[in-house]
Structures are given as C-alpha cells and as structure tokens.
Amino acid sequence: MTEMIYEYDGSFEGFLTCIFESYAQKEVLTAISCGEDIPFTLFPVRTVLTDRDHAARVYRKVVKLSPEAADLLRRGFLTCLPDREMHLYRLVVKLLEEGPRFLRDLSDETLYPILRAVRHLNGEVHQYKGFVRFSDLGGVLGGEIEPKNRVLPLLRRHFCDRYRNERFFLYDRTHQEALFYAEGRSAVRPLEHFQMAPPDEAEARYRLLWKRFYDTIAIRERENPRCRMTHMPKRYWGTMTEFQGEAHFRARGTPAAVSGPGAPTAVSYTHL
C-alpha cells in the first residue's frame, strides 16, 4: 500500500471522503491536512475533493458498527485536538479492522486522546451555555465568544430554543464563523474579518446597568477570587459584559449595527 498525504477542504464531509479514498485507492495516510497546514514531507500529496455520497457511505458504516464511535467521530472533529484528523482516521481504521470492542478500553492509545478532547469540548459547550452575553444591535441580538473548540454546532439547539422568537447571531472569534438564527431557521457559516459595532445609547445604558448590578450584589467580605475562577475561568471573561472596561459602555453609534466585510449580507437572514 502507498503512503500518502491528503489535502482536503476542512469540512467533516471532506474528512470522511478522505477515509473513503484511502480505502478505495489502497493508500495509507501519514497526514490529513487542510490548505496551508500541509507539513513539509517527502511523501506525495493528493488533493481530495469532497464527495457527499462517499462521505455518507463511510458515516453509515461507522454508525452500523458503533453509534458511540459515530458520536465520537462527529464531536472529535469539532475539538482542538492537535492533528485531530489523523487521530480520528486511526479510530475509524481500528473500528473497521477490529470492531467496536476496543471502545470499552478507556486506556486504549487510539481512543484515549479522542475521549479526552471530546470531554474538553463538552465542558466548554456547557460553560458557554451560561457565559454568553448578547447585545441589542438594532433589533438583532449579537454576541461573541472565544472558544478553543468549535462549539457553535453544539450550542445551536440550545440558543435557538432559548431565543426562538428573536433574531440573533453568535460569532466565534477563534474560528471566524457565526451561528445565525431567525424565524425558526438557523445556520453556522464562515464569517471572516468581523468586528462588532459599538452600542447605541440605549444598549450602552443596559450594559452599564448589568455591570452595576453584578458589582452591587457582590458581598465584599466573602470575595474569593480563586473560587470564582474555578467556576468562571478567566479565559471566558473577555466577552462577558460584567468584566469589561469603560470603552465597552460608551455609545458611539445610533443605532447599533453589525459591521465587517460580509456581515450585512449574512445578518439580513434572507438566505438562511
């Protein structure tokens, strides 16, 4: 069998297509890379075009062998695990060759890194269900987050159910993508070079009121910074209203709106 590096488009369907191609072409993968992430190597590189039919065949096979493995595959692809494609590729190869029995061994060297990464992803999703702060941007609710993992697909149902009568978007600064929702329809789409517009006067007042409320209900004599950081890790503070400086509460635009290349079209919601 030939050793090969595959380049793909970064999508989950594209990754599954890579697995299909590796078996169809009888090639052993040494790396699966997206765009500029291709490592310097002496192995040949082949670009694999996404084929949804081939991807669906691979996924159906995984589900048939083990629904648990299929869930690990989907969630594992959303994690920040270094070289995650190769970890997941090895998981599928082992599943196809040995069956699902190894999934019971939590110390398995193929399984363990993925389990740990998925646990981290699930924890981050849980945290963001409580740590997202939305602002009123001219009739549209807008929020920003800075996750380590791609959490938006897993937060989608929670926020769409919670704000089903609103129009909103939630922007992931780390991965430059956003969740859009309006009138019962939602989509997670790429959104590069986005910058949230400053608040109008009404929104600025509400932000300030929230911060004052947060500061007022605090019991100074019982402050415990270490305990607070345990339950509310500091890396989440950058997008939370109650931890912002003066500039966050200064009105500069009337009304508030979304700004940034591609944003006006995306937030029109007509194409969801």
Protein language model annotation of sequence segments:
Residues 14-25, 90-97, 157-161, 208-215:
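Short, hydrophobic/amphipathic alpha-helical patches that form generic packing surfaces
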Residues 270-271:
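Conserved small/polar residues in nucleotide/adenosyl-binding loops
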Residues 167, 178-179, 198-265:
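Long, compositionally biased intrinsically disordered terminal regions
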Residues 1-52:
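N-terminal ordered "arm"
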Residues 1-5, 141, 195:
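Glycine- and acidic
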Residues 43-126:
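Charged, alpha-helical interface segments at or near domain boundaries
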Residues 30-41, 169-176, 191:
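A generic structural motif
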Residues 101-190:
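Internal, well-folded beta-alpha domain core
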